[in-house]
């Protein structure tokens, strides 16, 4: 790959903006696309994302557009950073404008709504089996990445050369380390399941259960992640890395996590809608909980923590009763 390669980042929220800022700082021609022309005009005028990253100015050469055709045709690499529930929709909109050399990656963490399918399956259904695909995942908060604080992630792809190219594209020796990982399934799965467990960690803390309970929940949540991964053919080692344990610990323990804050609000007695409104941004874990529930049921995998969180969010179960249900399960070996 050349020293510089053009890339279009699709999704101008906090994480999409942070990735675009990092890529532009790396010297790569970067175009940031947002679906709302008024929002993009505001970003262009302010030269920063005032809503989410007000203290981080856009690099001078970072370009912005609300024209999807322009964004897709401007670069051979597309990086989708959109909520999981619109992932397939955005790919369908992208498809008519694809270049012959287009390769597609995503930083979206989640599964397909109403089916629980992996995003790779959604992408292949829309784009066919020949399109090179990749996923980036790991413990990253947008504010810290945009501020240039030390960060590490992993990238996996259907094509080894694409994974290598993406790692070179994203890697910044000063602050951003990128590892390649051959486990395409595991990286996708870790990002979805950790969101659910993070809601559980917030619930536990909101109920005042303390550090012991939070740590037990993280540890057993990792087991559930590995269990589901094994059923889908993922490598168990992946879940001990950036996209598994790393992302899980980050989102379960730091209040920058929307999923954790959502759980905290629920644990404090607020209902789902009120808690969601307080966050003011997409809480991916809310939808991920249903998606993981569907996927686990289809695979016949027992995930008791994720199941109790599903009951709280979608069946109105009292959070304290859900915690009691977990603690009162039959004795078993670790």
Curated annotation (Swiss-Prot):
<dbReference type="Pfam" id="PF07479">
    <property type="entry name" value="NAD_Gly3P_dh_C"/>
</dbReference>
<feature type="binding site">
    <location>
        <position position="257"/>
    </location>
    <ligand>
        <name>sn-glycerol 3-phosphate</name>
    </ligand>
</feature>
<keyword id="KW-0963">Cytoplasm</keyword>
<feature type="binding site">
    <location>
        <position position="258"/>
    </location>
    <ligand>
        <name>sn-glycerol 3-phosphate</name>
    </ligand>
</feature>
<dbReference type="GO" id="GO:0046167">
    <property type="term" value="P:glycerol-3-phosphate biosynthetic process"/>
</dbReference>
<feature type="binding site">
    <location>
        <position position="284"/>
    </location>
    <ligand>
        <name>NADPH</name>
    </ligand>
</feature>
<feature type="binding site">
    <location>
        <position position="247"/>
    </location>
    <ligand>
        <name>sn-glycerol 3-phosphate</name>
    </ligand>
</feature>
<comment type="similarity">
    <text>Belongs to the NAD-dependent glycerol-3-phosphate dehydrogenase family.</text>
</comment>
<keyword id="KW-0547">Nucleotide-binding</keyword>
<feature type="binding site">
    <location>
        <position position="14"/>
    </location>
    <ligand>
        <name>NADPH</name>
    </ligand>
</feature>
<dbReference type="GO" id="GO:0046474">
    <property type="term" value="P:glycerophospholipid biosynthetic process"/>
</dbReference>
<feature type="binding site">
    <location>
        <position position="259"/>
    </location>
    <ligand>
        <name>sn-glycerol 3-phosphate</name>
    </ligand>
</feature>
<feature type="binding site">
    <location>
        <position position="109"/>
    </location>
    <ligand>
        <name>sn-glycerol 3-phosphate</name>
    </ligand>
</feature>
<dbReference type="InterPro" id="IPR013328">
    <property type="entry name" value="6PGD_dom2"/>
</dbReference>
<keyword id="KW-0520">NAD</keyword>
<dbReference type="InterPro" id="IPR008927">
    <property type="entry name" value="6-PGluconate_DH-like_C_sf"/>
</dbReference>
<keyword id="KW-1208">Phospholipid metabolism</keyword>
<dbReference type="InterPro" id="IPR036291">
    <property type="entry name" value="NAD(P)-bd_dom_sf"/>
</dbReference>
<dbReference type="GO" id="GO:0005829">
    <property type="term" value="C:cytosol"/>
</dbReference>
<dbReference type="Pfam" id="PF01210">
    <property type="entry name" value="NAD_Gly3P_dh_N"/>
</dbReference>
<keyword id="KW-0444">Lipid biosynthesis</keyword>
<feature type="binding site">
    <location>
        <position position="140"/>
    </location>
    <ligand>
        <name>sn-glycerol 3-phosphate</name>
    </ligand>
</feature>
<feature type="binding site">
    <location>
        <position position="138"/>
    </location>
    <ligand>
        <name>sn-glycerol 3-phosphate</name>
    </ligand>
</feature>
<comment type="pathway">
    <text>Membrane lipid metabolism; glycerophospholipid metabolism.</text>
</comment>
<dbReference type="InterPro" id="IPR006168">
    <property type="entry name" value="G3P_DH_NAD-dep"/>
</dbReference>
<dbReference type="GO" id="GO:0005975">
    <property type="term" value="P:carbohydrate metabolic process"/>
</dbReference>
<feature type="binding site">
    <location>
        <position position="15"/>
    </location>
    <ligand>
        <name>NADPH</name>
    </ligand>
</feature>
<feature type="binding site">
    <location>
        <position position="142"/>
    </location>
    <ligand>
        <name>NADPH</name>
    </ligand>
</feature>
<feature type="binding site">
    <location>
        <position position="35"/>
    </location>
    <ligand>
        <name>NADPH</name>
    </ligand>
</feature>
<keyword id="KW-0594">Phospholipid biosynthesis</keyword>
<dbReference type="GO" id="GO:0047952">
    <property type="term" value="F:glycerol-3-phosphate dehydrogenase [NAD(P)+] activity"/>
</dbReference>
<feature type="active site" description="Proton acceptor">
    <location>
        <position position="194"/>
    </location>
</feature>
<dbReference type="InterPro" id="IPR011128">
    <property type="entry name" value="G3P_DH_NAD-dep_N"/>
</dbReference>
<feature type="binding site">
    <location>
        <position position="109"/>
    </location>
    <ligand>
        <name>NADPH</name>
    </ligand>
</feature>
<dbReference type="GO" id="GO:0046168">
    <property type="term" value="P:glycerol-3-phosphate catabolic process"/>
</dbReference>
<dbReference type="InterPro" id="IPR006109">
    <property type="entry name" value="G3P_DH_NAD-dep_C"/>
</dbReference>
<feature type="binding site">
    <location>
        <position position="282"/>
    </location>
    <ligand>
        <name>NADPH</name>
    </ligand>
</feature>
<dbReference type="GO" id="GO:0051287">
    <property type="term" value="F:NAD binding"/>
</dbReference>
<feature type="binding site">
    <location>
        <position position="194"/>
    </location>
    <ligand>
        <name>sn-glycerol 3-phosphate</name>
    </ligand>
</feature>
<keyword id="KW-0560">Oxidoreductase</keyword>
<keyword id="KW-0521">NADP</keyword>
<keyword id="KW-0443">Lipid metabolism</keyword>
């Amino acid at each position: 790959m050349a020293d510089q390669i053009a890339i279009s980042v699709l999704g101008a929220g906090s994480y999409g903006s942070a990735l675009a800022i990092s890529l532009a700082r790396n010297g790569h021609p970067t175009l940031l696309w947002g679906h709302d022309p008024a929002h993009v005009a505001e970003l262009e005028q302010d030269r920063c994302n005032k809503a989410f990253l007000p203290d981080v100015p856009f690099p001078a050469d970072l370009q912005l557009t609300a024209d999807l055709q322009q964004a897709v045709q401007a670069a051979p690499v597309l990086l989708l950073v959109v909520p999981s529930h619109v992932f397939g929709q955005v790919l369908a909109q992208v498809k008519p404008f694809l270049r012959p050399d287009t390769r597609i990656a995503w930083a979206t963490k989640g599964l397909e709504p109403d089916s629980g399918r992996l995003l790779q399956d959604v992408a292949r259904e829309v784009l066919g089996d020949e399109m090179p695909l990749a996923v980036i995942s790991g413990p990253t908060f947008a504010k810290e990445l945009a501020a240039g604080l030390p960060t590490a992630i992993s990238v996996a792809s259907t094509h080894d050369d694409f994974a290598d190219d993406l790692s070179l594209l994203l890697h910044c020796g000063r602050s951003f380390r990128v590892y390649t990982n051959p486990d395409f399934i595991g990286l996708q799965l870790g990002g979805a399941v950790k969101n659910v467990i993070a809601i559980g960690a917030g619930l536990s803390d909101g109920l005042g259960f303390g550090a012991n309970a939070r740590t037990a929940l993280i540890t057993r949540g990792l087991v559930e992640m590995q269990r589901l991964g094994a059923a889908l053919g993922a490598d168990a080692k992946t879940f001990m890395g950036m996209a598994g344990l790393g992302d899980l610990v980050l989102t379960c323990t730091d209040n920058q996590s929307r999923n954790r804050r959502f759980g905290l609000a629920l644990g404090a007695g607020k209902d789902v809608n009120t808690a969601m409104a307080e966050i003011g941004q997409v809480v991916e874990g809310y939808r991920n909980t249903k998606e993981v529930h569907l996927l686990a049921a289809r695979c016949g995998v027992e995930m008791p923590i994720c199941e109790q969180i599903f009951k709280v969010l979608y069946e109105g179960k009292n959070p304290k009763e859900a915690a009691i249900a977990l603690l009162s399960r039959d004795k078993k070996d670790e």
